[in-house]
Amino acid sequence: MHVAQQIGAVPLRREADGTQLVLLVTSRDTRRWIIPKGWPWPGVEDWIAATEEAREEAGIIGHVWRDAIGTFTYEKHQPRGSLLVRVTVFLLEVTGMLEDWPEKDERERAWFTLADAARVVTEPELKDLLHGLVGSVSTRHLSLDPPDCC
């Protein structure tokens, strides 16, 4: 079976008490909680495309780690059948949230602890990836102040 490739971002921020939060968005069709993700952009580095997908889908800006933190696979259901997709994931340190963004009217966004995010996502490998981040992402790397809104 052919495996399609996507790129995605795990948007993180650190609260004043050191708690790490991840921003999830809802999918457009099923309204399940997911990370911002999309198809690679021809001629654009994957980490840059992941940053742009996060801006378009979640209305966030920040600093992205250029090395992927992992992958997960999921089954994408389309009108012409299902497709197996492998998502390469990049960590995005959120520095700001936009009040208006391209997919604002199509998705919800919400902050979760990493453990809660792992509970609400449905893709098993994404659950594992989020569980793996608990305690492994050094708070010194997330030294930015949390965004003013949301």
Residue ranges and their predicted role:
Residues I35-I69:
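The catalytic Nudix box helix
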Residues D29-W33, V94, L98-C150:
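Nudix hydrolase/Nudix homology domain
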Residues T71-D100, A110:
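Active-site-adjacent beta-strand/loop module that shapes the phosphate/pyrophosphate-binding cleft
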Residues A16-G18, D29-R32, W41, I48, ...:
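Short, charged/polar surface micro-motifs in flexible loops or helix N-caps
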Residues M1-P36:
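N-terminal strand-loop-strand
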Residues M1-A4, L12-R14, T71, E75, ...:
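Class I (Rossmann-like) S-adenosyl-L-methionine-dependent methyltransferase catalytic domain
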Residues A4, G8-R14, V64-I69, T88-L91:
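Sequence/structural signature of beta-propeller domains
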